[in-house]
C-alpha cells in the first residue's frame, strides 16, 4: 500500500450556488470549513517498546449553527507501515465530508509490522490500530461539547489499511479474535491508548478499498456499512480472489454478507480502476457523492439497525401456504412489495397460468434480498416476476440512490441464479403515481439502470409499463389509483394484466 497524494482540486468544488434541493450530509452545503491540527488524543506503546503520543486533526463546518453534529473518525491507509492523517485521500475525504456538514477527526496511530513479517504480525498491527482508533472515539465522547459532536451519531471510516482498521473495530468482537493471536501480548481490542471510562461504540462504517479477515464477523444487528472499491484493485481485493496478508474479503463480499444478515449497507464499485481508484478525480468525487447520500439516510434514521424481520409473519404465512400446495414446475412466481400483495385477483387475471402469489409489505429491495431464498427456493419455477424498489424511492430521508437499488437487485439475482440458473427473471418497472411524483426523475433513472442491466444478462428481462401508465401529458393518471394516491385500483391492475399476459406469452 503506497502513499497517495491528491491535488486539493478534488475538494475545491464550486460553492457559488445551491438549489433548495441540496441537503446537509447528502450534498456539499458549507462553503468553508475550520481545521484544528495535531490535537493530542492518547498514547500507547509501539513495537519499539516506546511510548508514542497520538494526535488527530479536526475538520468542521465553518459558521455552523448546529450544536451537535455527527462525527466521522477517519483512519488513513499505508499498509500499517506508513501514511499520515493529512496527506492524500485522508485530507480529501475529511474536507469533503466536513463541507457536507460532518465533524471529521482524522487520526494518526501506531505504525509498524513486527519481524518476521507474517499474517500474524499484520493482524497484530491491525489490533494496535483498532486500539488507537477506539481511543480516538472515546476522546470525542469525552470532549463532545468542545467539538460540537452528537455522541449518538459517531461513525468510523478509513482507506485501505485504515478501512481494515475501521471494519474490524466495528465487527470483530473480543471473543472472535483468532486463537493464534496472543492477547496477553497485544492487549484487549479496547486497548489502553487513552480516555478510559468512555464508550468506543460507533454507529456505522464507511470502507474505502479495505477488506476483512473473516466476513462471518458481520452478523444481524451489527452497525451499517458502506463500501467503495475499484474492481481492478491488485492490492486489496474488492471480492475474494486473493488476499492482502490474510485480509481476503473485500467490499463486494462485505456488501453481500451485510445484505444476507439484514444489515443496512451499500456499495460503489468503479469498474477497471485499481487501489485508491487510481487517483481518478471523477471516480473519487462520484464515490463521495454516493457516500454522502448513504450517510444522509443513516444520520436521519431513527434506529441504526432497522427491523429486518418486520414482515416475518407474512413470510411464514407464505411458507405455510407453500407446504400445503403442490405447485408444478410450470408455476410462475410473482413477488414484491404491496403492489404485488394487493393484486388480489392476480390468479384469475393471469389464468390459466399457474401463479404463486407472494407479495409482502411495504417491503424494500433490501428486504427482498433478505427473504428471497425463503420466498423462492422451495419451488421449481417456470419464471420469476419481481416488483421491488418502489418503497426505496418514497420521498423519504431513507430513500436509496438508484445505484444502490441496482446493486441490491444484482445480489438478489445472484441468489436466484444459485438455485435457478436458467429460469427467466422479470423485473417490473417501478410505476408512476402522485405520492411519489416528486422523485419521478429518480424512479426513471432506476428503471433505466435496471433495464440496461437486464439487457446484458441471459434470461433476464425488464417489463416496461411506464408508457401505458402515463397520460398524454406525460404525468401519472389519478384514475388508475385508489384513495391513497399510490396503489392501483381495478383499472390500474387491468393495465398490468394486459402487459403481464403479453410478457408471459413469450416465456419459452
Question: How would you describe each model-predicted region?
Answer:
Residues 135-221:
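Primarily recognizes the serine-hydrolase "nucleophile elbow" in alpha/beta-hydrolase
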Residues 86-106:
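Short amphipathic alpha-helix adjacent to the substrate-entry channel of hydrolases
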Residues 122-145, 408:
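Alpha/beta-hydrolase active-site loop
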Residues 21-67:
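N-terminal cap/lid segment of alpha/beta-hydrolase-fold proteins
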Residues 248, 255-304, 482-508:
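C-terminal catalytic histidine-bearing segment of alpha/beta-hydrolase fold enzymes
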Residues 67-78:
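Short beta-strand element of the alpha/beta-hydrolase
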Residues 277-279, 285, 431-508:
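Catalytic His-Asp segment of secreted/periplasmic serine-dependent ester chemistry enzymes
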Residues 340-354, 368-406, 426, 430-434:
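Oxyanion-hole/transition-state-stabilizing segment in secreted/luminal serine hydrolases
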